Regions:
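Structural signature of hydrophobic alpha-helical transmembrane segments
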Residues: 3-18, 66-82, 134-146
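Juxtamembrane transmembrane-helix termini in multi-pass membrane transport proteins
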Residues: 8-43
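Hydrophobic core segments of alpha-helical transmembrane domains in multi-pass membrane transport
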Residues: 6, 44, 49-53, 77-88, ...
Length: 192
C-alpha cells in the first residue's frame, strides 16, 4: 500500500476516534478545555508512535520466532504501560502544569484502547515496519486533530447561553461527537 495513502487514510478516513471509535474515554473526558486536549493529544502521539515501533519489534523478533504469537495482547499492554510511565515521568519533570491538568487521564493512556488498537491493527494488517510507523503517525495525528476540534467546539458551546441547561455538558458533547463522526464519514469516498 502506498505510504502517503496509508498516512492520509489513517488520519481522515480511518480516524482512530471518529471512525474506529477507539479512545473515546479521554476524548470525552479531556476535551473540555483546548489546552488540556492539546497536551493529551501530544502525549498520545508520542506514546502511539513509540509503542507501535516497540510492539512491532516485540511481535516480529520475539513472539513470532518463539511461536508465542498468542501472547501479543499481554506483551503489547506491558510495552505500552512501560512507555506511559516514561511519558508520565518526563511530563512531571518538564511541564508540571500540563501534568496536573491531565490528572488521572495520563495514567489512563496505559489502558487507552487507541494506543493498543493501533498496535493490533498494525499486526492484523501484517504491515511492514515502515507501514506500521506511517499508520501509527497518521492515527496518532488523527487523535489530537479530533480531540482538539472537539475541545474547540465544546468551549464555544459552553459560552452560548441559548443552549438549554439539560443539554449542557456530556449530552451536547455526545451529539457533537456524533456529528463530527458523520462529517468524517464524508472522507470515506477518497479511497476505494
Amino acid at each position: 500500500m502506498d505510504l502517503l495513502l496509508l498516512f492520509v487514510s489513517s488520519i481522515f478516513i480511518h480516524n482512530i476516534l471518529l471512525s474506529r471509535f477507539l479512545g473515546c474515554c479521554p476524548f470525552m473526558g479531556v476535551s473540555t478545555k483546548l489546552e488540556t486536549a492539546r497536551g493529551m493529544g501530544l502525549a498520545v502521539v508520542f506514546v502511539i508512535m513509540l509503542s507501535s515501533l516497540m510492539t512491532w519489534l516485540v511481535y516480529h523478533y520475539v513472539l513470532v520466532p518463539l511461536h508465542l504469537e498468542y501472547l501479543y495482547t499481554l506483551s503489547f499492554i506491558l510495552v505500552i504501560a512501560a512507555l506511559v510511565q516514561f511519558v508520565e515521568l518526563a511530563l512531571k519533570k518538564l511541564n508540571p502544569g500540563l501534568y496536573k491538568s491531565l490528572g488521572i487521564f495520563l495514567p489512563l493512556i496505559t489502558t487507552n484502547c487507541a494506543v493498543l488498537g493501533v498496535a493490533v491493527i498494525n499486526m492484523n494488517e501484517n504491515y511492514t515496519l515502515a507501514q506500521s510507523l506511517v499508520n501509527a503517525l497518521g492515527s496518532s495525528l488523527g487523535f489530537p486533530l479530533a480531540i482538539t476540534l472537539m475541545a474547540g467546539i465544546r468551549e464555544r458551546l459552553d459560552q452560548n447561553d441559548a443552549i438549554p441547561k439539560c443539554l449542557r455538558g456530556l449530552p451536547l458533547a455526545l451529539v457533537t461527537a456524533g456529528l463530527m463522526s458523520i462529517a468524517f464519514m464524508g472522507f470515506s469516498g477518497m479511497v476505494k
